[in-house]
Amino acid sequence: FDRMSKIGPCVSIFGSARTPEENPHYNLGVDLAEEPSKRGYGIISGGGPGIMEAANRGAQKGVGQSVGLNIDLPFEQNHNPYIDSAHNLEFDYFFVRKVIFVKYSQAFVALPGGFGTLDELFEALTLIQTNKIARRPVVLVGKDYWSGMTDWIQKTMLDAEQNISPSDLDLF
């Protein structure tokens, strides 16, 4: 907490570790991180490759703070070279890492990803929905990618089952 408290306002960017550099989503991740970084926001990613690397790369291009919240996994997750050395944090548990994502971010951006991306996204949405954290922007990038999920949320969770409120659709 002490290291993060010195960074200032941040934007968290979620996305797949498996996205290669030649994928258009990678370049979009770089661009999306660069803009808030130029405006003084730190960029927080999961610290790994793929979209996470793209986010940290964009943070460095924008000369902002580049933070990586790396998780110790038996496969796939090594920290990327675009994290500021003072802001490369290592975690053993996902729930602790998610606390840091949520506590220090003023906005959340989700690019295409897998189960980890969904876990981070729904953690943020749930905490906003239940007023455990203040309302802040949650942006889903890539309409084609997310439309199946957002349609399901509306048609199944809201319309068919009434498991969420109509206002919950305004969270993202």
Where are these regions (language model features)?
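Active-site/ligand-binding-proximal alpha/beta "capping" segment
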Residues: D92-V141
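Residue-level signal for short, function-critical loop segments
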Residues: A17-T19, G113-G114, D144
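Amphipathic, Lys/Arg-enriched alpha-helical "gate/interface" segment within cytosolic domains
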Residues: M4, C10, D72-S85, F95-K98, ...
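Short amphipathic alpha-helical segments
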Residues: N56-R57, N80-P81, E120-E123, D151-I153
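Acidic/glycine-enriched connector segments
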Residues: N27, G50-A110
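Glycine-rich beta-alpha loop segments
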Residues: F1-L69
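Alpha-helical elements of the RecA-like P-loop NTPase motor core of helicases
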Residues: E53, D119, S147
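Short, solvent-exposed amphipathic alpha-helical segments in soluble enzyme
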Residues: Q60, E123-I128, Q154-L158
